[in-house]
A protein has these predicted regions:
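Short, glycine/acidic-enriched capping/hinge loops at junctions between secondary-structure elements
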Residues: 19-22, 89
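NAD(P)H dinucleotide-binding glycine-rich loop of Rossmann-like/cofactor-binding domains
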Residues: 41-53, 79-109
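Short cysteine clusters
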Residues: 16
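Short Gly/aromatic-enriched secondary-structure transition segments
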Residues: 21-29
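Glycine-rich beta-strand-centered segment in the early N-terminal region that forms part
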Residues: 1-13, 28-82
Length: 109
């Protein structure tokens, strides 16, 4: 993990209506992300996303410049946004990995 980030292992992840909507209508969703400034213009409608934003995860490793308030092995959940990436949605924005992957990154808050 980079500075300020936490590497977590996905333990469980729900299937949300948003996941289904992105799967079926990615072009519309990405248009909204572009309009809101959540996705760079160079990322097109065919960008791949690793979905999963309603999750329970386990802390695996901390990056530099983190407070490490919770011990490695703690179970966590979070608001699925990365403040370090202008509010990019975990598991909904291209360039972020969601909890359908085995491991993914979160910002330490």
């Amino acid at each position: 993990p980079a500075a300020g980030q936490v590497l977590v292992r996905s333990l469980a992840c729900g299937i949300c209506g948003s996941d289904l909507h992105i799967t079926r209508h990615a072009d519309e969703v990405f248009d909204v992300f572009h309009q809101l400034g959540l996705m760079p213009d160079e990322v097109g409608e065919h960008a791949q996303v690793m979905l999963g934003h309603e999750f329970c995860a386990e802390i695996v490793e901390y990056g530099a410049d983190t407070q490490q308030t919770l011990p490695v092995g703690s179970r966590v959940t979070s608001v699925p946004m990365l403040l370090s990436q202008n509010g990019a949605g975990v598991g909904v924005t291209p360039g972020t990995y969601g909890a359908y992957s085995e491991y993914f990154l979160l910002d330490e808050a």
